[in-house]
From Swiss-Prot:
Annotated domain remarks: The KEN and D (destructive) boxes are required for the cell cycle-controlled ALK1 degradation by the anaphase promoting complex (APC) pathway. The protein kinase domain is predicted to be catalytically inactive. However, weak kinase activity was experimentally demonstrated.
Modified residues (Phosphoserine): S76, S79
Positions with biased composition (Basic residues): 362-386
Biased composition (Low complexity): 251-264, 398-408
Domain of life from the UniProt record: Eukaryota
Function description: Serine/threonine haspin-like protein kinase involved in cell cycle regulation.
UniProt GO molecular function: ATP binding; histone H3T3 kinase activity; protein kinase activity; protein serine kinase activity
Protein name: Serine/threonine-protein kinase Haspin homolog ALK1
EC number: 2.7.11.1
Gene from which the chain derives: ALK1
Post-translational modification summary for this protein: Periodically phosphorylated during the cell cycle with a phosphorylation peak during mitosis and hyperphosphorylated after DNA damage.
């Protein structure tokens, strides 16, 4: 609704003349339409055009805003100026129109009606309001009103008046009262020194007449910086000079009232719209220090810390946008001085997380350089450091002190050393146990190997072999030497059984290569020597051992040396025969157990490779165990003959899968692994449980072959099954997923003797 400017002047003049008369508060529940019909309020059109947002405003010098919120006014071509001397409004050109940017409350216009309302635009109050205020009910809620010119004069004269002498809150209606209650004090930007005469920036205007007795709730440090009015350049004539009057806005806050009560008292305030100038620098960034001293805001702790505006209002084209901006950040802090100082500190201080990350990226710990003792590692580290410094120069600069030790350590005595791993105690024990009885040249603890020349060591082994042979010299057929038991047999009738075994009539010839005399083949010679020694020892008084007929060394035409071992024919390996019945299977098993028990009891013997190929059976059903290269026994001189568990002979069967099925192949290496776990890689130790492992292997394989060819309905088959179950309970060699179970507690079978006692 657009009103002519003369009506506005008339209403304001009448309100000024009657400003000293205190009228009773009006009913809060009177409808808003009632006052619209009576025209007892001032309301001007608010344009939605952006060009109209720059309306110029020159407000009254004494008009004050309460601590809840401040809205700025717009002004058209003519501006209304009110003098401070006589408290009267100055009239400008009658053709000009003034536009206000929000509905205000009713002016104090004289009327014959009984109820009147105080306007938010009231410019002054007299001291009589204080008297009428004291005469009214003390229990009513007290509100702070806007300060008039006299209140500003009171502030300038440092008069101490109680804050309880404010007028009651009056409103035009419930809707406006709720609206103004929600609005908080949030100025966009303080405009220090706007409209203040030169030389009087720090002094508020004084009254020429008597001072008002209305209590002032704020002192000099509670005044806020004035806001710069915006000018509507599109409608204002450029030739018309604009006269500016000092504009002061007092920021009032009560120490006793809470934040909610302070905000709720906004209904008795004077609301205006304003718009920040695009080309103007915010007040916080301007070097205007005297404005902060002149218009400090008082926080809840009465400190002189200036209140920093928390809501930067940008260009708003409508009241709804401005309303949302005001309400979006309407928050108060009970300790604004502490909070403001903390905010400044936090802005200047980096977070701990980012600081720690930056430090870790830029620095290298000195402890990481302790292991870089070799010269090559330091040079590599230096090159990497140089590359990283090219990528991030600041990083290299910050870490130069930390990395100085890495560059200086080049010239130290540690720079030419090579850092080697240090084994723990468990690894040391394993290495010592492995090397204690090792026959290799690298082992100094071995009794069979001494520090000597390699050729001398090879010749020593060859002499020992000849000493254990039946013929103590090397036979050379090229020179006419006759080979015993072989020259008498036609070689055309020989049958090759394996790669190094032939059957010549009733004689089994095993041919083992020893290499040439000049070659260092100590491993072959050593294995041949051990096998020959074991056979010599076992043939003295034990059954089930192959009978060695002759042994000698032959030098063939190619210059190679071969050890010939001639045995009696003891039958065929059980892997190549067809089993007849379960009784035969059970006899094979117990015969092997008896042979091993005799050797175990007298020689502390362990076969350690009792496969089906190493068990022979003749036409009479007699069982013979062969191939003792991998076995372990103790000589009468208490020497231990054994082969280390990591020797390739334990893995030879994997290369010849054609002779064994997949089940047998996998089961063999499960037993190998079980032995390594049981012996803890100490192959020289005597552990009779290894014989039980292989007997368990033999029983399982025979049971599988019997089930496939003979069926399961047999009493001897049940006996074999009970033995297998008993061995499983004691050996725990059954596995799932390739790993052995923990050994059970019921260990009633510890050797082959215990097994024979249970099933005698």
């Amino acid at each position: 609704m657009l009103l002519h400017f003369d009506i506005v002047i008339q209403l304001l003049s009448s309100h000024t003349l009657k400003s000293h008369q205190v009228e009773p508060p009006m009913d809060f529940e009177t409808s808003f339409e009632e006052f619209v019909e009576d025209k007892r309020f001032i309301a001007l059109e608010v344009s939605d055009n952006d060009d109209d947002c720059d309306t110029d405003l020159t407000a009254d010098t004494a008009d004050e805003l309460e601590s809840s919120a401040i809205l700025k006014m717009r002004e058209s071509d003519a501006s209304l100026n009110v003098t401070t001397g006589n408290n009267t409004s100055r009239k400008t050109t009658s053709n000009s129109k003034k536009r206000w940017s929000l509905l205000s409350n009713h002016s104090a216009v004289s009327s014959s009606k009984s109820k009147k309302r105080w306007s938010v635009l009231s410019s002054s109050f007299t001291s009589e309001s204080h008297k009428d205020r004291e005469s009214r009910n003390v229990l009513q809620q007290k509100r702070k009103s806007l300060q008039s010119y006299s209140s500003l004069d009171t502030v300038a004269s440092n008069s101490s008046i109680s804050a309880s002498s404010s007028l009651k809150r009056s409103s035009t209606g419930l809707s406006l009262r709720q609206l103004f209650t929600k609005i908080g004090i949030n100025d966009d930007i303080s405009q220090p020194g706007i409209g203040i005469p030169q030389g009087k920036e720090n002094l508020p205007p004084t009254m020429g007449k008597k001072n008002s007795s209305i209590a002032s709730t704020s002192s000099e440090n509670r005044l806020r910086t004035p806001l710069k009015p915006l000018v509507n350049h599109s409608k204002r004539p450029t030739s018309q000079p604009q006269q500016q009057q000092p504009l002061y806005n007092a920021s009032l806050s009560s120490r006793r009232s809470s934040i909610s009560s302070t905000v709720s008292s906004s209904s008795s305030s004077k609301w205006r719209f304003w718009k920040r100038n695009k080309n103007q620098t915010p007040a916080l960034l301007q070097p205007d220090h005297h404005s902060l001293k002149t218009f400090p805001a008082v926080n809840r702790r009465d400190s002189m810390t200036p209140v920093e505006p928390r809501n930067m209002v940008k260009h708003k084209t409508s009241f709804s946008d401005f309303h949302k901006t005001i309400f979006s950040s309407n928050t108060y802090s009970e300790s604004s001085d502490t909070i403001s100082s903390m905010e400044i500190t936090l802005k200047n201080k980096a977070s701990s997380s980012s600081l720690s990350l930056n430090v870790l990226k830029k620095r290298n710990s000195q402890s990481s350089l302790k292991h870089k003792s070799s010269h090559a590692s330091l040079q590599k580290f230096k090159r990497n450091k140089g590359k990283s410094s090219m990528i991030a120069p600041s990083t290299a600069t910050n870490s130069s002190n930390d990395d100085s030790c890495s560059y200086s350590s080049k010239n130290s005595t540690l720079s030419h050393r090579i850092s080697l791993p240090v084994p723990d105690q468990v690894s040391r024990d394993k290495i010592q146990n492995k090397l204690r009885y090792s026959t290799s040249l690298l082992s100094l603890n071995s009794k069979s190997s001494l520090p000597m020349n390699k050729n001398d060591h090879d010749e020593t082994l060859l002499r020992q072999i000849l000493l254990n042979c039946d013929i103590k010299r090397i036979l050379n057929p090229a020179k006419g030497d006759v080979l015993p038991l072989i020259n008498d047999v036609n070689h055309l009738s020989s049958i090759q059984l394996t790669s190094n075994v032939w059957q010549i009539g009733e004689v089994i010839c095993k041919k083992v290569s020893l290499g040439t005399i000049d070659d260092i083949t100590w491993d072959r010679k050593f294995l041949s020597l051990q096998e020959l020694e074991k056979l010599k020892i076992m043939q003295q008084k034990f059954d089930g051992i192959p009978q060695l007929l002759k042994s000698f060394v032959v030098k063939e035409a190619n210059g190679g040396l071969y050890l010939y071992l001639l045995f009696k024919d003891h039958g065929t390996p059980i892997s190549l025969i067809s089993l007849k019945n379960w009784k035969q299977i059970l006899k094979i098993f117990w015969s092997c157990a008896g042979i091993i028990h005799g050797l175990e009891k007298n020689l502390k013997f362990e076969h350690r490779n009792l496969t089906l190929d190493n068990i022979l059976i003749d036409g009479n059903g007699n069982i013979t165990i062969i191939d003792f290269k991998c076995s372990r026994l103790q000589t009468p001189q208490d020497d231990v003959l054994y082969l280390r568990l990591d020797h390739p002979l334990f893995f030879l069967n994997g290369k010849d899968k054609s002779k064994i099925n997949e089940y047998q192949y996998q089961f063999e290496f499960e037993i190998y692994q079980s032995m390594r776990i049981l012996l803890n890689m100490d192959a020289s130790a005597f552990e009779p449980m290894t014989n039980l492992y292989w007997l368990y292997y033999l029983s399982r394989v025979l049971l599988k072959f019997g089930d496939r060819k003979l069926g399961k309905n047999d009493a001897n088959r049940d006996k074999m099954a009970r033995v297998i179950n008993h061995l499983e309970m004691n050996l725990a060699v059954h596995k799932r997923g390739g790993q052995l179970f923990k050994r059970l507690e019921t260990e009633d079978i510890k050797n082959t003797g215990d097994l024979l006692k249970l099933y005698k």
